[in-house]
């Protein structure tokens, strides 16, 4: 244990200790009367889910709450500590060797600082959410974090997460096979996808269509481990399957790039910025660039068009796309104008 947070002593738990059961921690995660406060919880939750099939519930994510409360996009913990707790954060141990045991006193202090300020930040942000009536907005986002589907990637669907510029069905078929192999390989060996090959390497492979290990050797982006052995064999088999299949994927109907979409997407970006500024919410929490392109191309089954996002932005985005409203610059600000 170490320095106290507002609610009592802060404690370090070392999951690398041989034979240590994390079940008491997971029991706390399941305890419904105790709110678990995290900052940027998603990666932590993915670990807990795959390790034990458990989520800390109820959960409060200070990064999401801060984005709803006007602190900007993907606001860092250090920023919140400075602005809300008004404390400095010693980052000198950030890049030390965390696998070495025992941890140094400086490392322990650094690790404990990740929680010692969370209570003050939580209390401040919940008070802000109560004032603005936006607690339900945060609850919507947390519900996504606590949904097992958020962390399950099925190999057959992995290609849908790869961003591509080409809508060629044959190219997409090769992307699909390469993504399927990568996902299966990563899951079987419990390694990150990027350790197999990154998205940019996947796109390069789908474009160059290597058929031999000699072809793989010419890749600019493939890691050395991917040029031989099981990964190389998997890549070559995936490319061959993608070239030979008759089951060609169809580009999504809301795929960006159809004629006339670019201008509308730009108008939607202006509307998003204006609406986000007016609501003091980070724009990226409302809609991504891909969401705007999809709306401009006719996509309607999108998070940006439902729930609290529809109130803030989505409803007017659809009206703008339908020509029912226009945008006007007035007194240095963007205004929505009804079209009669």
Stretches found by the model and what they are:
Residues 105, 121-340:
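Accessory DNA-binding and partner-docking regions appended to nucleic-acid-acting proteins
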Residues 70, 109-110, 123-124:
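Catalytic palm subdomain of template-directed nucleic-acid polymerases
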Residues 1-79:
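Conserved RNase H-like, two-metal-ion catalytic cores of nucleic-acid enzymes
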Residues 79-107:
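A short, charged helix-loop
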Residues 60-63, 92-101, 131-142:
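Short, surface-exposed recognition loops or helix-turn segments adjacent to catalytic cores
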């Amino acid at each position: 244990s170490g320095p106290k947070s507002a609610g009592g002593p802060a404690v370090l738990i070392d999951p690398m200790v041989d034979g240590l059961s994390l079940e008491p921690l997971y029991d706390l995660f399941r305890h419904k009367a105790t709110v678990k406060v995290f900052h940027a919880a998603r990666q932590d939750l993915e670990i807990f889910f795959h390790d034990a099939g458990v989520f800390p519930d109820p959960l409060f994510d200070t990064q999401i709450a801060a984005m709803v409360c006007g602190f900007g996009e993907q606001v860092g913990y250090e920023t919140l500590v400075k602005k809300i707790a008004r404390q400095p954060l010693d980052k000198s141990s950030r890049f030390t060797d965390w696998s070495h045991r025992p941890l140094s006193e400086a490392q322990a202090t650094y690790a404990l600082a990740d929680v010692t300020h969370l209570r003050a930040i939580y209390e401040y942000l919940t008070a802000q959410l109560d004032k603005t009536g936006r607690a339900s907005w945060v609850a919507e986002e947390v519900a996504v974090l606590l949904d097992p589907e958020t962390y399950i990637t099925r190999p057959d669907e992995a290609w849908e997460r790869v961003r591509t510029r080409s809508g060629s069905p044959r190219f997409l078929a090769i992307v699909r096979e390469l993504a399927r192999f990568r996902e299966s390989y990563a899951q079987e060996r419990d390694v990150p996808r990027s350790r197999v090959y990154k998205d940019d390497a996947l796109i390069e492979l789908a474009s160059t269509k290597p058929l031999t290990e000699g072809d793989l050797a010419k890749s600019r982006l493939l890691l050395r481990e991917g040029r031989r052995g099981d990964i190389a064999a998997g890549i070559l088999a995936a490319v061959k399957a993608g070239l030979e299949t008759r089951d060609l994927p169809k580009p999504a109907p809301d795929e960006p790039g159809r004629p006339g979409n670019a201008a509308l997407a730009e108008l939607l970006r202006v509307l998003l910025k204006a609406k986000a500024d007016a609501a003091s919410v980070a724009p990226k929490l409302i809609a991504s660039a891909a969401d705007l392109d999809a709306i401009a191309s006719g996509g309607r089954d999108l998070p940006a068009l439902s729930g609290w996002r529809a109130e803030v932005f989505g409803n007017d985005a659809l009206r703008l796309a339908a020509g029912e409203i226009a945008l006007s610059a007035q007194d240095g600000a963007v205004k929505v104008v009804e079209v009669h």
